[in-house]
Amino acid sequence: MQYPLPIARLIDSFMKLPGIGEKTATRLAFYAMDMPKEDVDEFAQALVDVKEKLRQCSVCGNITEQDPCAICSNPVRDRSTIMVVEEAKDVMAFENMGEYDGLYHVLHGVLSPMDGIGPEQINIKSLIVRLQKNDAAKEVILALNSTPEGESTAMYISRLIKPAGLKVTRLAAGLAVGSDIEYANLITLKRAVQGRTEL
């Protein structure tokens, strides 16, 4: 049996989300159909707002409603330390930890030659330019996921910025190989930042 076109389209739309298969998408579509209209309108507006009202910070690449973002424009933040992360969700993980008070730089990915992702496709060039302009920066913390791509990206960035005389550190062991920062618990993240090692 074929679903009516609006349901079929909604199922297809849900299946575009990561980790959502056909069964889950079907369940969500039928749940949405039973939701009150104002809840559906609010959900749809939230999706539109994410695309229309958020942008990347021109300084660090984090997601923001204002430019520069609240972290970059906060005068209390420690400007001597810049933590480089893969995705904006990693910034949220470190901010929730509540221990790090420096700045961030979001790459929006990692080097992955097999997928055609080189240095030009991620936010590396702006990091180098930022470090050249920022006399206050003394340390760059490479807080990338413990995957082969994360490790190779960290080594690539380290080789680029080491000649400038900046201290380059990597998060301490404790994050399992292949694990994502966003899923690490706060204690593990805290220990990884505190025990970081110099490259």
From Swiss-Prot:
Keyword vocabulary terms for this entry: DNA damage, DNA recombination, DNA repair, Metal-binding, Zinc, Zinc-finger
Alphabetical list of PROSITE patterns matching this protein: RECR, TOPRIM
Molecular function terms from GO: DNA binding; zinc ion binding
UniProt record, GO biological process: DNA recombination; DNA repair
Keyword Metal-binding: yes
Domain of life: Bacteria
Zinc finger (C4-type): 57-72
SUPFAM superfamilies on file: Recombination protein RecR
Pfam families: RecR_C, RecR_HhH, RecR_ZnF, Toprim_4
InterPro entries: DNA_Rcmb_RecR, Rcmb_RecR, Rcmb_RecR_Znf, TOPRIM_dom, TOPRIM_RecR
Role according to the record: May play a role in DNA repair. It seems to be involved in an RecBC-independent recombinational process of DNA repair. It may act with RecF and RecO.
Family, similarity comment: Belongs to the RecR family.
Protein name per UniProt: Recombination protein RecR
Organism: Lactobacillus delbrueckii subsp. bulgaricus (strain ATCC 11842 / DSM 20081 / BCRC 10696 / JCM 1002 / NBRC 13953 / NCIMB 11778 / NCTC 12712 / WDCM 00102 / Lb 14)
